[in-house]
């Protein structure tokens, strides 16, 4: 399933009255959350929290006015995911600063409404030949975002191989 197949995304993961998937700024696919506690917009590219605002309050997380939206380009502002390294790559100057997680599509794997009315989305990074050329380690990364009275973001990396892996993230 393509992450830009909004009908399929909404059929599988939407939560009526709380969560929908739609084209966002620059045509990027986004999850739009509105629940009893807050509202948020999360780009599927980078699993990037672009906005978060407590209910009936001004935004606490927002995008830069200089933000540009294009597939494969990092979004300025919000809460970007830096993975699997932070800053410049240790040995390859041509690799992107702060890793590639900000510029690739993440897959939605789970959505749920919590007992207190918060909305939780779980994303998994989608790797391809280009990302494996930069990060050839057996691993998985998930970004778990909970929109409630507070904004909770949990980045989880799992080593799925037998060799030790060193990474940096933010």
Question: Where are each of the predicted segments found?
Answer:
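Surface-exposed acidic/polar loop and edge beta-strand patches at domain peripheries
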Residues: 1-146, 150-152, 160-170
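Acidic (Asp/Glu) carboxylate-rich active-site/surface patches
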Residues: 155
């Amino acid at each position: 399933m393509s992450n830009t197949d909004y009908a399929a995304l909404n059929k599988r993961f939407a939560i009526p009255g709380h969560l929908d998937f739609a084209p966002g700024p620059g045509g990027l696919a986004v999850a739009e959350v509105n629940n009893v506690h807050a509202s948020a917009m999360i780009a599927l590219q980078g699993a990037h929290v672009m906005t978060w605002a407590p209910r009936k309050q001004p935004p606490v997380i927002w995008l830069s006015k200089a933000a540009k939206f294009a597939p494969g380009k990092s979004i300025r502002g919000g809460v970007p995911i830096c993975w699997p390294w932070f800053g410049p790559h240790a040995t390859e100057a041509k690799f992107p600063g702060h890793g590639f997680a900000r510029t690739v599509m993440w897959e939605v794997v789970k959505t749920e409404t919590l007992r207190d009315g918060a909305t939780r989305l779980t994303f998994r990074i989608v790797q391809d030949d280009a990302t494996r050329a930069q990060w050839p380690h057996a691993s998985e990364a998930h970004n778990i975002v909970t929109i409630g009275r507070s904004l909770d973001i949990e980045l989880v990396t799992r080593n799925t191989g037998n060799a030790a892996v060193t990474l940096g993230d933010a």
